[in-house]
Amino acid sequence: MEILLYAVGIILMAIAIAVSIALHEVGHLVPAKLFNVRVPQYMIGFGKTVFSFRRGETEYGFKAIPLGGYISMIGMYPPSPAEVKEHHEEGHSGSTSPFASLAEEARAADAERLQPGDEDRLFYKLPVLKRMVIMLGGPTMNLLIGVVCTAVLICGFGTAQVTNKVSAVSECVPSVSVTHDSISYGECTDKSTPSPAKAAGVQVGDRVVAVNGASTGSWEAVSSAIRAAGSRPSTLTVERNGQRLDLSVTPVEMIRPVSDGKGQYARAADGSIATTRGGFVGVSPSSELVPGSITEVPAMVGDTLSRVGSSMLSLPQRVWELTVTLVTGGERSAESPVSVVGVSRIAGEVTATDRIDVKAKAAMLVSLVANMNLMLFAFNLIPLLPLDGGHVLGAVWEGVRRFFARLTGRKDPGPFDPVKLLPLTYVVAGAFIVMSIILIVADIVKPITLF
């Protein structure tokens, strides 16, 4: 049954990824057709076509490698400058450099798709703003999916809120090991000292209502009171089976990670996990999904995008560190990036675990889809070709050049020519392919696990 549930999670996430890719391309397709650009193909995946059908002038289909998608629009590349044409007309062979050959081949391939009547349906002839709308349509769809999934998560399932109910009682006082990126606790042995909570008789299911007579309205208040007590004897007041009991505990002072209040570890100035010394009792809180308001959605989306942005800035470094980990056999950081394979494995782990109920599993899957789409939104806005952000930047650059040309009375500089950046485009695309291979291999041989 566990294997079946694991497979269900992978299949569900694969469907979610495919739908996200498909809607991303719809975001490009719809405005392109509205602006009368001919779109010969709408494809999900890359490589050999597995299945396709034609409706109107567009072929819709699926390809063998489901790692993305695309729409092809005619007129992506403007013709060569007039002076180059004149140069060829004079009988010269033109540049024989590899880059020039690439440019000529790209223009030739683009020109081969032209049909009679396409003269006014070319992408590069559109006004700058319309081209920007087309290229931003895909990322905008991912943003909308992320916002909708976040709204479903907050208003439908609710977000995890820590309660005062005890979910676990430590058997012993563990040893603590803190590294730059992780914190681990030693295993209990026969020689380990029983935890203060275990010695005091605290049980799973107890609700902590007061510490040393002071009411605790939140688990943060419980933790603060225990940390403040240090190693001094304290009284925990708990509710158990409708009755209140006073339990005497003596906290043990030990190193503790500092929480950022959002379920993550706070960070020190050097980026390491921040720690402090405080009292340890040995109880862990439970969490419940508490539905929120639609007004909470913008803040959560903004927070997610902020974290995605910070993560993207350090992406090259983290991919390099992951590569070193793969080569040296070290331990993979839980904060390392993952591929679609890793996301699917995490989804399978969520559906297969018996540690959370069905509602919590569904909420985690929706959260995965939301975060994935918000990441795709931000990633596609990187201002490098062949990403959407690169095309947007090119359109903006064209608009700026033409504006200043009109302002100064100079000749129109013409449309932005992405062919001139083909070498850079291939380098960027190659880097993305290498990164994807590294992440996929890591997700297979050193997967991140949640449970």
List the predicted regions and their residue ranges:
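Small-residue-rich helix-interface/hinge motifs
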Residues: 4-114, 118, 372, 376-406
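Terminal peptide-recognition signature
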Residues: 24, 62, 197, 205-208, ...
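Internal alpha-helical transmembrane segments
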Residues: 34, 69, 76, 92-178, ...
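Hydrophobic alpha-helical transmembrane segments and immediately flanking/interface helices
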Residues: 79-95, 162, 335-350, 437-451
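Functional transmembrane alpha-helices
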Residues: 118-126, 170-174, 184, 256-377, ...
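Conserved PDZ fold ligand-binding element
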Residues: 189-219
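PDZ-domain C-terminal substructure recognizer with occasional recognition of PDZ-binding tails
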Residues: 203, 209-210, 221-276
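Final/C-terminal transmembrane alpha-helix of multipass membrane proteins
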Residues: 421-443
